[in-house]
Amino acid sequence: QEGVELRQAGLAQPVLVLGNLTHPDELRACLHWQLMPTLSGMREALLCQNLAAGSGRAMAVHLKLDTGMSRLGAPWQEGQRLVEAIAALEAVQLAGVYSHLADADAPGAGLDPLTRQQQQQFEAVLTGLQQAGLPSGARHLANSAATLRSPGLHYDLVRVGLALYGHRPAAHLGGGLALQPAMQVRAR
């Protein structure tokens, strides 16, 4: 919905849809409005292939890998196999590979063990892709917390969430930034 509104407002830059789109109508809207859906498996990739091939134009997508968040994404161990399969699809273009950090806002200096493990798993997939000569497109791992505290996790893109809305991802992060909340949540 938000991606369509951005297009209707005249935004021409690439727009990545971070949610899990599995219904053909959702993916058809992505194709029509030139939005990049997030894929978490071959089912969605094949739907994109069929829709895009029928329209005569390619569809750019990002593949999300689950490295520990356990919310959305293909198991990271399947990353290289999925990229190989997606690369073989004529009407689907892999524009990026990403994952989401589960605990990047943990207190303490440096990376917490889970974030370090997630980075290692993500790196293992990227290394495998490079060695096999497969495309990764834009690589992205950093959420707001990792953007603020871990430059080594920035790769090609960062995905700020809470910080975009003027909120620090944790009380101990971003204290030197002049973030101004863009929203409030109230309840009675």
Residue ranges of model-derived segments:
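N-terminal active-site wall of soluble small-molecule enzyme domains
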Residues: 1-35, 39-46
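Acidic (Asp/Glu)-rich catalytic clusters
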Residues: 7-12, 28-32, 48-58, 83-94
